[in-house]
Every structure is written in C-alpha cells, then in structure tokens.
Design a protein with these regions (language model features):
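Nucleic-acid endo/exonuclease domains
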Residues: 1-140
Length: 140
C-alpha cells in the first residue's frame, strides 16, 4: 500500500484542488459528525472527511473499493459498535450523506471506479483524470 503522500486519495484530492484553484483542508473533522459511542468516548469520535473547501462549502469523499466491495480480512473485525468494520463503514458513509448536506455543505463522492485502475491503483493520466474529477465536481 502506498503511503498517504502517494495514495490514490491524495492524487484525487490534489486534482480537486487544481479544479477549484484552492487547496482543501485534508482530514477535517466536525463536532457534528461523529462515530458510534464507545465506553471511552461516549459521544463518539469525530469522523474525518477526506477534503473540505470551507470557502466553497464543499466536502469531497474519495471512496475506494472497501466502500462498495467487501474486504473479508478487515470487514469481519468487530468494532465498538458491535458490528463488523464493513458494516460500520457503510453506516458512517450513510451518516456523512445525511449530515454533511444538513449542515449546509455540498457533499461530492468520487468513486475510485470512475478512474482507470490497474493492480488496485489509479493509472495516472492527468488529462483524463482531471476530466473525471471535473465531471464529478460539476454534477454532484
């Protein structure tokens, strides 16, 4: 797996920065967007969003395979919610789809499957990929 600097998420968010002309706040957390409670965190932990452009009121979530395809090794692990990681991920994605717009922000979800992928990584083609990103940002 690539480090965060070379990750597909970083690459796609960098393309979003280019389209918008300003950099995102990466891994921003909001007090109103929280995970499930646990014994040590009764209010739940704040959940990060991948990219946030405060001046534009836009949040971008980049969704890789694990958001739509089960990953048995990781998904079976129980979480503080008492459910597997895959189910928890689905719950948190749904929570973001509801709460982000409720708080006056526009949520754009960019699926990894929108890009050309080889060996589970985006095949970097800047011209093609920026067109994909631009299309997602303009239609969502």
């Amino acid at each position: 797996m690539a480090g965060r600097a070379g990750s597909d998420e970083r690459y796609v968010l960098d393309l979003c920065d280019e389209v918008f002309g300003i950099p995102a706040v990466r891994q921003e957390r909001f007090d109103w967007l929280r995970g499930d409670p646990s014994p040590t965190r009764p209010r739940g932990t704040t959940l990060p969003v991948d990219g946030y452009w405060p001046d534009l009121g836009v949040v971008v979530e980049f969704q890789e395979e694990q958001h739509s395809t089960p990953v048995p090794f990781f998904d079976r692990r129980q979480t503080v919610s008492g459910v597997g990681r895959g189910e928890q991920r689905r719950r948190y994605d749904a929570r973001k789809r509801v709460l982000v717009p409720e708080h006056g922000l526009r949520l754009v979800v960019i699926e990894k499957s929108a890009f050309t992928v080889s060996s589970r990584r985006i095949v970097r083609d800047r011209t093609r990929d920026i067109a994909v990103v631009r299309g997602c940002l303009e239609t969502d």
